[in-house]
UniProtKB/Swiss-Prot annotation:
Protein name as catalogued: CinA-like protein
Family listed: Belongs to the CinA family.
InterPro entries in the record: CinA (IPR050101), CinA-like_C (IPR036653), CinA_C (IPR008136), Competence-induced_CinA (IPR008135), MoaB/Mog-like_dom_sf (IPR036425), MoaB/Mog_dom (IPR001453)
Pfam family, one: MoCF_biosynth
Superkingdom, taxonomy of origin: Bacteria
Length: 427
C-alpha cells in the first residue's frame, strides 16, 4: 500500500472564503510527485478544538503524514503549534537559539522604523511564542518570522509537518521538510506514479464522457488508470495518474482520444494554449483590438514570459467612436452591420495591425450582457477576427454564462483561433 497523507488548512479567513486556499492544491501536487497518496484535504477555523478534531480525523483514517498550513504567527489566534504539540503528546519548550534567530530577523525587518530599544523588546516579546517548539521536533528555518516544525510520528501515529500560511513561506519550507528523516521515514512506502495531462478544446463534457465509457470497455487495464476530468476556461483537462506498469493502457487511451477527437486535442504534454501561442509568436509582431473583453486578451498574451518580444500593443475600443477614430473602422460598416458583426471585427483587426505596424492581429467584439442583447444578437454573441501572414479566420459564436464567463470564454476562443492561424490554418 502506498504512503498516505492528509492536509489541514487552518484559518477562519480561509474557511469563510475571504482568502482563497492556494496551499492545499500546491501541496497536493507535491505529494503526487513524491508518489504519496493524498487521502483528504480539510479546512477549519483557528479554534484549537477544531484543529485537534481534524488531526484526530486524519489519524483515525490511518494516514502516515499530516501537513498543516497556517496559525504560526505571534498573535493570540495562532495556536496550531500548541495544538499539534498536545495532539502528539509533547510539551512545548522554548528554543533559545531559535528565539535569537527570530529576534535577528525582526531587527532587519524593523531597521527602517527607528524603534526604540524598549519598543523593539515589546515586538520581540510578542514574537517569542514562535520559538516554542514541541519537544523532540525538528525545526524548519523560517522564511518570514514563523518557523515550521516536523513532529516525528510513533508506531501507529502519523508524522506531522507544521507549515506557515503564506505560500511564499510555505513552499520553500515544505521542500526542506521533505529532506528530514521523520518525513522520509513516513513516506517510505510511497508508490511511484506517472501523471499525464491532455488538454482539449471544442468538445462537450458529455462527448468526452461517452468516449471514456467506450474506452473502459475496449482497453485492457483501463481500471489501472486514475482519470480526472475538469472543465476550465472553456477547455477540458484530462489528468491521468498511473503506475509505470500501466503505461500501455494509457497509450491506448491516448490513441482513442486522437482517433475520436483529434481536432479537439491540442495538447498532450500539459502545455496550455497560452504557452503554445507564445512559442508560435516567436519572430512575429502582434496587436489586439478589443471591445467586450476590454483588454483581457492583451493581458493574457502579456502574462507569458518574453511577451515584450512580440506584443506591440492593444486598443480597447468599447464605443463606436474610438472604433472609427483609433482603428479606422468605417462608420458606414457599423451602421450597416452593427458593432457586433464579422465585418466590424475584421476591420478592427486590420486597423490594429496597421496602427501598431504588426503582422498579426486579433479582434473581439461582442455582447457580454446582462443587457444589450436582441432576438437577432442575444447576450453571448461574440465575433472574432484573426489576421496573420497567410491566414485569416473569422468566427461568430454564442457563448454561455454570465458577463464574466462570456468575457473569459471569449479570450479562450480568441487564443485558440490565434493558435490555428499561427499554424497556417485559415477559413
Amino acid at each position: 500500500m502506498s504512503a498516505r497523507a492528509g492536509i489541514v488548512i487552518t484559518g477562519t479567513e480561509v474557511l469563510t472564503g475571504r482568502i482563497q486556499d492556494l496551499n492545499g492544491p500546491w501541496l497536493a501536487d507535491q505529494l503526487l510527485e513524491l508518489g504519496v497518496e493524498l487521502a483528504h484535504i480539510t479546512i477549519c477555523g483557528d479554534r484549537p478544538g477544531d484543529i485537534a478534531a481534524q488531526l484526530k480525523f486524519l489519524a483515525d483514517e490511518g494516514v502516515d503524514l499530516i501537513i498543516t498550513s497556517g496559525g504560526l504567527g505571534p498573535t493570540a489566534d495562532d495556536l496550531t503549534v500548541a495544538t499539534v504539540a498536545e495532539f502528539c503528546g509533547r510539551e512545548l519548550v522554548l528554543d533559545e537559539a531559535l528565539e535569537e534567530r527570530i529576534a535577528a530577523i525582526l531587527r532587519r525587518l524593523t531597521a527602517g522604523r527607528n524603534l526604540s530599544e524598549e519598543n523593539f523588546e515589546a515586538v520581540r516579546t510578542a514574537n517569542r511564542k514562535q520559538a516554542l517548539i514541541p519537544q523532540g521536533a525538528e525545526i524548519l528555518e523560517p522564511v518570514g518570522t514563523a518557523p515550521g516544525v516536523v513532529v516525528p510520528g510513533s508506531p501507529g501515529s502519523p508524522t506531522v509537518v507544521v507549515l506557515p500560511g503564506p505560500p511564499r513561506e510555505l513552499q520553500p519550507m515544505w521542500l526542506r521538510a521533505v529532506d528530514t528523516e521523520p518525513v522520509r521515514r513516513a513516506i517510505a512506502g510511497r508508490t511511484v506514479y506517472r501523471q499525464e495531462m491532455i488538454r482539449m478544446f471544442g468538445l462537450a463534457e458529455s462527448g468526452l464522457a461517452e468516449t471514456l465509457r467506450a474506452a473502459e470497455q475496449a482497453i485492457s487495464g483501463f481500471d489501472r488508470l486514475e482519470i480526472t476530468t475538469c472543465l476550465r476556461r472553456g477547455e477540458l483537462e484530462i489528468v491521468t495518474r498511473y503506475e509505470p506498469a500501466a503505461a500501455d493502457a494509457y497509450g491506448q487511451l491516448l490513441d482513442v482520444l486522437r482517433d475520436r477527437h483529434g481536432d479537439a486535442v491540442y495538447s498532450e504534454d500539459g502545455s496550455t494554449v497560452d504557452q503554445q501561442v507564445a512559442a508560435l509568436l516567436a519572430g512575429r509582431r502582434i496587436a489586439t483590438a478589443e471591445s467586450c473583453t476590454a483588454g483581457l486578451l492583451a493581458a493574457r498574451l502579456t502574462d507569458q514570459p518574453g511577451a515584450s518580444e512580440y506584443m506591440m500593443g492593444g486598443i480597447v475600443a468599447y464605443a463606436n467612436t474610438p472604433k472609427a477614430e483609433m482603428l479606422n473602422v468605417d462608420p458606414v460598416l457599423i451602421a450597416e452591420h452593427g458593432a457586433v458583426s464579422e465585418p466590424v471585427a475584421e476591420a478592427m483587426a486590420t486597423g490594429a495591425m496597421h496602427h501598431f505596424e504588426a503582422d498579426t492581429a486579433v479582434a473581439i467584439t461582442g455582447i457580454a450582457g446582462p443587457g444589450g442583447g436582441s432576438t437577432e444578437k442575444p447576450v453571448g454573441t461574440v465575433c472574432f477576427a484573426v489576421r496573420a501572414e497567410g491566414a485569416s479566420i473569422t468566427r461568430t459564436l454564442l457563448l454561455p454564462g454570465n458577463r464574466s464567463d462570456i468575457r473569459e470564454r471569449s479570450t479562450t476562443v480568441a487564443m485558440h483561433l490565434l493558435r490555428r492561424a499561427l499554424r497556417g490554418e485559415s477559413d
